[in-house]
Amino acid sequence: FGDYTTSFPTLYERVLKPFLTGVFLSDPKIIAADVAQEILRSFVKSLPGIPAGGVGQFSQALAAPVRNLKLNERVESVAKDKVITNSGQYSAKFIIVATDPTTAAQLLTGVTIPKMFESTTTYFATSELPTDGKNLAISSNSKLVNSIVISQVSAKYAPAGQHLVSATSLFPVTESVFRKELASIWQMNTQQWQYVANYQIKQSLPAHLPGQSKSRNSFVADGIYVAGDHMATPSQQGAMKSGYLAAKAINQLMQ
């Protein structure tokens, strides 16, 4: 980001830095430049959105073509040609471990755990609409990295007859701090807003530091592959791309 910070210091500090901090859940200056540029291009080339029925729709869409799907089983070990769970053993010539990096490292040797960034997101419901737009609100001097009236993007997210506001911070803060910061961001009284939920995710996103490959080799050993955003770029796109590359490698071996 050297060119941006030197040529457009005000634009970077007031707009790009707070926006990208919310994207990477960290100071964007520590993120590999090629990764940051790739993700920025994805924002420019397409319109960001959310699934109308929640992010779980991604998992449902991926699972839909699977003929024999086993759920609610804890995987205890993975080895050549077999997966052992708390319910039994399954045999397979090829295995893809598509989990968070910590779980993958616990199941397999040779998988490294990258530095992980945390985040805390809180949701409030309100009868008074903070804005009639769908824009993401950012601030360079707030304890929150961003906020959005998520129900303006998809009305199904809000309780009946109300609007749903989402806000994210990079560290745990109290409900009262969320209310205070949101009052400043949206320029309105938030004391009557209804608290809905709070999600503190310790391992929200992997750090992709300079020198790391944008697409790591997913092959581990003995027909076992690993997929996840920690194997590509820290984003949903990265996770999907990693899964695609692992599946492609297996498909080529099966032909």
Question: How should each PLM-predicted stretch be described?
Answer:
Residues 150, 155-255:
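Conserved flavin/dinucleotide-binding core of flavoenzymes
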Residues 36-86, 90-94:
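Helical element adjacent to the flavin cofactor pocket in flavoenzyme catalytic cores
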Residues 3-4, 15, 19, 57-65, ...:
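Amphipathic alpha-helical segments that form well-ordered structural scaffolds
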Residues 30, 46-50, 57, 73-74, ...:
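FAD/FMN-dependent oxidoreductases across multiple families
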Residues 74, 100-101, 201, 229:
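Flexible loop residues that form catalytic
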